[in-house]
Amino acid sequence: MGDLNPAETPEPKKNPVAKIASNLYSTQIVKPVPSVSNSTNLSPCQNPNMTNLFYITLLQNKLNKYTQQLLKKNEEGLNDPLANVEQFNIIQFLQNDVDFNLPIEAFEQGNMDQNIRIDPILQRQQMANQPMLMPQHMLQQLHQQQIYEQQLASMPMTPAITDLTRHGSSSSPSTTNSDPPYSPEGLNNFGLGTQRPNHGVIPNDISNVPQHINRQFNPRMGPNTSPNPPSFPQFLNSNHPTPGSYVQSISPDSNGQGFAQSNLYNALNVSSDESINGSDDIPNRKRPRMDQNMDPSFIMHAPVSGKLGAEVTEEGGQPNIRFFKYQEEQWCPMYDANGEELGRLQVHVLADKGFNYSTNDNCFVNQKKNHFQVTVKIEAIDPSPPQCFKINGVCKPIENFQLSFVGAKSESQNSEIPIRQSTTERKPILHTPVLFKIVERRMTIVTVPRLHFSETTLNNQRKNLRPNPDQKYFNLVVRLYATATDGTTVLMQAFASERVIVRATNPGSFEPPEMVDASWNKNGGILSTNGPVVIGKSEPRAQLTVDGDIYSSGRVMYPSDIRLKDNITEKGAKDALENLQKLRIVDYFYKPEVASKWGLTEDQRKRTGVIAQELAAVLPDAVKDLGDYLTVNESRVFYETVLATQELCRLTGDLDQKIDDKVAEISQRLTQYAQKKKMLNSMASGLNSEGRSLNASRTSLDSSASALTLTNTKKNRRSSRKDKKDAPKSKMTHGTVIGLVGVMAFCLLAMSALYILDWHNRNFGYHHFTPSATTSGPKEGPGNVVIPLDHYVPLRQPDAPPLVPFCPMETCRGYCCMEYDKDHAELEITEYDPNTATDNDFGFKADTRSDFTLKGFGNNVKISLPELGMQIDERYCIEKSCVKKRKVYSLFIPMTRYLPNVPLEVQIDVPSSKVVNNCGYIQEFDNRKCDETGSSSTETDAPRSIQLFDNTFQVSAGQWTQSAYRFRVGYSTELCSIDDTHFGGFYEEYNLIFYRACNRTNSTAINVV
């Protein structure tokens, strides 16, 4: 059989009935099933002759008309695909099965492909029960002939009628006279990039179905568990939203949006007269294009390259306009019949046509006269559909759902633009909402064609072929409403499109292709433009706007020539240092939603910088509002840092100069002080208070003169013995002695004068005494330098009023003066008389001198004792203890014995921009506690300075005979850690020295320690 020539084969076309019969007896694949009326009377045990007669009679009646039609056709007509009865399933045709519509590709396949599979056990049972109509050798011969004839097929059948080019649309419907384009041989295996196994024929075995078909819609799909799957298995079970269950039909333009109609299942249309062609006329070689609805169950999923959803692009790479949620705060939730709140509907809005993206305008453009079409896909994911909604707590049943379209101005969302819809005669009418239904777990697709904007946007006129800066925009708003039975309508969901320009001119003619990039000039490899350039955003904020990071291997250069500048003034650096101290440098992370929008990685989220709002309070000109967010001019902050650095350098230079001057001055003063001290020590050794030093000096002088005379006499005698010519030398010796005596007399006068001055200073000037007996040698007064705070306290302050100057009662107790009373027990105690207290030399004079004027500290700093109602000012300064140039103020505050040993409250008022630093007690000062032994304080027992409130402190001065406390005022809270040598710089220092003045003025005072 394999060596037969096709020319030598029998002529099967002359006897089609014989071929059909041979096919019937040779295949024996499917057992013929009798009609319902005869199925009850037949059984395998009946007479085989009766069975054969039944099948022959049925075959003769069914093929009578069909045989006549085939015999009428000429030889050329047998080439029609419908005339190829080689693979005609006569058993199914005899059964009058409604599902006999086999795919066309089935006629191209032989039985060797085994597209129809039967279980081997069931096949053997059918063969055992089926009567033998022909001998076995005849069946084998017919089967071999059938295989040979199948090998003769060399040309494919006419392809299926499917518009894969998407030329059909709602605006240009296909006609019956148009012919499909020529299809090559492999067209049957082409389906938008989707591979079709088994040459497009779906086998009965459900397990061979590709997995991508099962993922056609949602994962809510189960396998087909039917025990007897039909010839065309249902890929989706009953509870799955199959395309066949869609309420609305799919628009022809929806092809290519993720679904493609399969060209595998074009059924044979049987006419009323049971003929295959439905007409006695001979059909044409080319079948006409038919506008017939495809069975939705045959829609196959065709993967589309690229992104889906809002970023799906149209054919040719044009992006589709995107829709976003709109007025979400006005959405009304839906409820089921039980009053349970349902989830939001899954809505996808797609503009099928009418919107063209303009790269020059950076937005979508719509031509007002050309309509646009919108497809809305709605799916309820809940098991129950929406039944009602609530208004003011009242549940109202839903009667219907409506889909409405309206335009809105981008700059004013409250201004709405009506949408019109053209009729089939292209007559525009006002658009009315479209009614639709929502079925649980089903997808509803609503396509609304022929829509128009009733107005055009403003400022559409171009300026020099560039976008108008005053261009206005529209937004297309899609709203889903729910209407109750009483007429109440609420907004379910709403979506707004991107901004759109609506023009009265066709966008294609408005922007010629050669003029789209007219603003860009290309000169060799250089591309230039005079307009702004935007990367990653839609609106320019500057000449170059970049939404993201900029990587540059070089530097960013900009001109700074003096020829380009005018009104050049030097900026002062006075406030730069203070502004820099107010800046706060922080580490921060961008919010996750911002990082996702800007495309930042986790490492790029962390930044170091300043906060724009905080910087605006310090440097307003460094912050700009360019639209959505505040931006920082970092160069302005940089130059402010340069100014602050210059100010620091200037302050450092001034401090260095002052330090050098002061060191030289102190060195000179120390030299003079050392010379005076040496002279005073030598003079004080020969002076006393009774004037005996003068007699001793005279005696010493006489003794010296006598000794000198005796010596000279002896020398004269020796010299006279040696040489009598030496007599004139004695005269020179007498002159020398007289000169020495004169010098000694002058020295005595000078010493007397110095003694008188020293006595005057000890009795009429401010001096210090040394209460500690352990100190080696007496320490002198301060001189012209700042007083060293060790243990000096003034003996008398006539201008400084003491704390509690007199006893307010007849009998008062004395505090912390036991040691003083022991040392001055022999002194006379006078009665206190308020009338004569001012004339008493031993009392405290609260009045100031006539030449004393209260000036304050000059820095708006006020120190007071609120409990005693006293003001501490310059009256408590002694000689050189308050130096304004150095900003050091040492205030000596006397306390009488009548002040109890209780803590004192000190209040220091400073300007709001400054801070008071509590530095505690002065360690180098000789702090002496009130006790019977009078010993100095230990490390564990020291004066205390505690802050009670802002600028209010409590010191333990009442419990100490003498104690010192230090406070510093400045712009920082770390002033106490600065070295003491940095005077006159960033802070002011106030030293409060409290000491007991124990000279009593009242005999009735009782000493209490």
From Swiss-Prot:
Which segments show compositional bias classed as Low complexity? 169-180, 696-711
Q: Which InterPro entries match?
A: MRF-like, MYRF_C2, MYRF_ICA, NDT80_DNA-bd_dom, NDT80_DNA-bd_dom_sf, p53-like_TF_DNA-bd_sf, S74_ICA
- Boundaries of every Peptidase S74 domain copy: 560-659
Q: Where is the composition biased (Polar residues)?
A: 205-217, 234-278
- The segment annotated Disordered runs over 161-293, 688-731
Q: Name one GO cellular component term.
A: endoplasmic reticulum membrane
What does UniProt give as the signal peptide span? Answer: none
**DNA bind region:** 223-514
| UniProt-listed Pfam families | MRF_C2, MYRF_ICA, NDT80_PhoG, Peptidase_S74
Residues the record annotates as the site (Cleavage) are: P559, S560
A GO term (biological process) for this protein?
A: regulation of synapse assembly
- Segments on the Cytoplasmic face: 1-736
Question: Quaternary form?
Answer: Homotrimer. Interacts with myrf-1.
Q: What is known of its domains?
A: Myelin regulatory factor: The peptidase S74 domain, also named Intramolecular Chaperone Auto-processed (ICA) domain or Intramolecular Chaperone Domain (ICD), has protease activity and mediates autocatalytic processing of the protein to generate the Myelin regulatory factor, N-terminal active transcription factor and the Myelin regulatory factor, C-terminal components.
Listed name of the protein:
Myelin regulatory factor homolog 2
What broad taxonomic lineage does this protein's source fall under? Eukaryota, Metazoa, Ecdysozoa, Nematoda, Chromadorea
